[in-house]
Amino acid sequence: MKDLKVIFMGTPVFCVPILEELIKETNVLAVVTQPDKEVGRKHEISFSPIKKVAIKNNIKVLQPVKIKEEYEDIISLNPDIIITCAYGQIVPLAILNCPKYGCINVHASLLPKLRGGAPIHKAIINGYDKTGITIMYMDKGMDTGDMIEKAEVKIEDNDTAESLHDKLSAISVPLLMKTLPSIINGTNKREKQNDADATYAYNVSREEEHVSFNKSSKEIFNQIRGLNSWPGAYAVLDGKNIKLWSCVINNKKYDQAPGTIINLDKNGLEVTTTDGSVLIKELQLPGKKKMDIKDFINGNKKADYVGKCFK
């Protein structure tokens, strides 16, 4: 497939293995990625992970601020196929209609489940027991195009958004490379999505990062691990946001209101829920580093926490 002219559109680290494999196996004409960002107090310019790979391999980089208004440079390259993965903007019809083999998207869910920008987080938060990768044709909708191929992974109880991210990134490469030849020679499957089965995974809002203990232990467990390692779940104690990075479900039940801190020992910070309690195993105080429960106990007094209530 070395003569296959490809434009790749993507932004985060999830896409890096895909781009690296495409560079090895095809002729990548250009990479389209999100504009550079200023980060930190010094407002230093940060390149996307995909841009870094493109620069390393001397590949043309395009970074439209609004792709629906700035697509002529992309079309002028006359690609055979455009492959996207977590690009970050809605791709206009002018681009979708450009390549002879179409625009193909690598989406991190088993469509039509979890359409949208945060399928990895929401798969865990919403309690799914499996998810996967879907290779699909793009259309003008949000992840609504015809499906070509899928690969499935199980979501384990010890998975976090980070570990599931890595699992899905790893299986996306062989799935795409297995599927590409059939797309080129026209023998690929093409299955329409059933909109009645669709669920949505919109980007995580600030409100969704907040842990309300007025939920079941399982829901809180899923929320905390589904936001680890980015952006992180938090709860409010004494007016301060405390990051909660990991917990386990505890079978003990109490009469105290949900969110009440029952105990602090080597097993964790025990907090009541609507149907029992959870043990917080890893947390982070404002301005401090992430701590496991052992380090937290060494630097904090039990009496300062027990009896208080998370908001």
Language model feature labels by segment:
Residues 221-311:
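C-terminal active-site/capping subdomain that shapes the small-molecule cofactor and substrate pocket
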